[in-house]
A protein has these predicted regions:
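Extended, histidine- and acidic-residue-enriched regions that form the cofactor-binding/catalytic faces
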Residues: 1-110, 118-251
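Short, surface-exposed ligand- or partner-binding patches at beta-edge/loop junctions that are enriched
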Residues: 114
Length: 251
């Protein structure tokens, strides 16, 4: 049984085997993704990923409730770019904590955050630990993008060695959802100045500039994005997430 949380009636929810049902909570964001991709890129991808996951699970015996996408996240690193909206870290923490508390109150035992914006990961990880301790439920944190998968890496244009935010992969996925939302003719490529330090330092707002100090807002080159590449990325990512959901089902 796979269903959408918001589409169930109270009586239907009462009949759900809540102790053995996974609630998948997609975490989106509302932030700039360069000149070419919409502010809601992460939220749009989160919704599409849920659709692809549902298709991949059609032949599986699994109880899964898809929670509505949380459309705003922790985007402090993008706050100086026009249109970006962010929670404060503790606001975001308390909002997610309260959702988990409500779900636990109703008897759900298996919760899974589907992180569709990297900036949400630290809070999701913290919530996972706290909720397990406070409510004796099993919270999991899943990453929405199989960006290290060799078949996904193979979609990136030859010579493009960096694709982090608002680049070819994310832009391609949005093109699957609604090609009219992508304005490739306005795209710019860019690599934030501190990429050499990326393994050691968290991304800060000041990192989203070029070496010359120009605000860039993306990491990568979106000009090679295509709908076909987006289909590959969404499909492979959904298949990888499904593997994790099966493990959670059997946990």
């Amino acid at each position: 049984m796979i269903c959408k949380y918001q589409e169930l009636t109270r009586l239907e929810m009462e009949q759900v085997d809540r102790e053995n049902t996974i609630v998948l909570i997609p975490l989106g964001a509302l932030e700039q993704h360069g000149n070419q991709a919409p502010l809601g890129t992460d939220t749009l991808i989160a919704g599409a990923m849920c659709d692809y996951i549902e298709k991949e699970l059609k032949d599986e015996d699994i109880n899964l409730v898809l929670f509505p996408v949380i459309p705003v996240g922790l985007s402090t690193e993008h706050k100086d770019f026009c249109g970006s909206i962010t929670f404060k870290p503790m606001t975001y923490y308390h909002m997610l904590y309260d959702i988990c508390e409500s779900l636990a109150h109703h008897g759900f035992k298996k919760l899974a955050f589907l992180v569709c914006h990297g900036g949400n990961t630290p809070i999701a990880n913290l919530i996972s630990r706290e909720v397990r301790s406070d409510f004796k439920v099993y919270p999991f944190v899943l990453n929405s993008g199989a960006f290290d998968h060799p078949d996904v890496k193979a979609t990136i244009s030859k010579g493009s060695t960096f694709d982090f935010h608002g680049g070819e992969m994310e832009t391609s996925m949005v093109m699957v959802i609604d090609e009219s939302l992508v304005k490739l003719d306005t795209s710019e490529k860019g690599i934030p100045k501190n990429t050499a330090m990326k393994a050691h330092l968290s991304w800060l707002a000041s990192d989203w500039v070029t070496e010359e100090g120009k605000p860039i807002g993306i990491g990568g080159d979106p000009s090679g994005a295509t709908k076909e590449k987006g289909e590959i990325i969404l499909t492979i990512s959904a298949k990888e997430i499904v593997k994790d959901l099966i493990l959670i089902r059997d946990f």
